[in-house]
Amino acid sequence: MRRHLVTGSSSGIGAATCRLLAGPGSAFVVHARSNAEGAERVAAELRARGAQAVVAMGDLAQPGTAEALVATAVERFGGLDVLVANAGYADRTGLDDLTPERFEESLRVIGTGFLRLARAARAPLAAGSDPRVVAVGSFVAHSFRTDAPVFLASAAAKGGLEGMVRALAIELAPQRITVNCVVPGAIAKDAGTVSAMTPEQWRASLARIPLGRVGKPEEVAAAIGFLCSPPAAYVTGQALHVNGGLVI
């Protein structure tokens, strides 16, 4: 059985990743901070595909949440083989309105949350089969333009996340754990979910994307799925961009 913990998996990229990886012989901890209905819906879809699935709620900005999520995988499925750190949010608050507290919130959810997940997951991953860690970054840490929204706090948090991925790839290599990052560009949101950009900003973004469209969650999930697959066993410490050419 291949056992997965996918954070932020009640919708969007996280949900698409679970669907892609699900099948007989797989098991999932489906995580959400507040969207319990979405998480339960995803879990039901995974079970329909022959997978085992359990829902776990929690705010990764809070101490103890990451550890509890990993413990759920170990207790329910006997261990952990794949960690996908997808939870996070975009904050485009400008400098004048960005308080230190709000800035630190982005760092807690994205950076400190990933640190806690990695620390808690290290031992069960090392004992697992073909262990993988994939973090989900963002183009906002790479694309800075005067004609596009700037995400100051998110850029800092996601840029730091990529640095952590590279450092952990070195530290966890002796345990055969690969650590990589998938960096999405502008990706369509599921209906009913909140976007950090207005409809006008979404339309304007198309002009900056060489392929002329926003991406689909399933396209990002495909990159994550590759990094979790046997052919990616020799890939570690890398950032794989999925952005239609937005960042080249």
For the regions a protein language model found, what residue spans apply to each?
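Catalytic loop of short-chain dehydrogenase/reductase
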Residues: 134-160, 165-174, 186-187
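Substrate-binding pocket helix/loop in short-chain dehydrogenase/reductase
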Residues: 94-95, 99-107, 193, 201-205
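Short C-terminal tail/terminal secondary-structure segment
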Residues: 225, 236-248
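Conserved glycine-rich cofactor-binding loop
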Residues: 10-11
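Alpha-helical segment proximal to the catalytic Tyr-Lys
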Residues: 123, 170-171, 233
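Short, small/polar-rich loop/turn modules that mediate ligand/substrate recognition or access, typified
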Residues: 130, 173, 178, 235-237
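Conserved glycine-rich Rossmann-like NAD(P)H-binding loop of the short-chain dehydrogenase/reductase
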Residues: 24-40
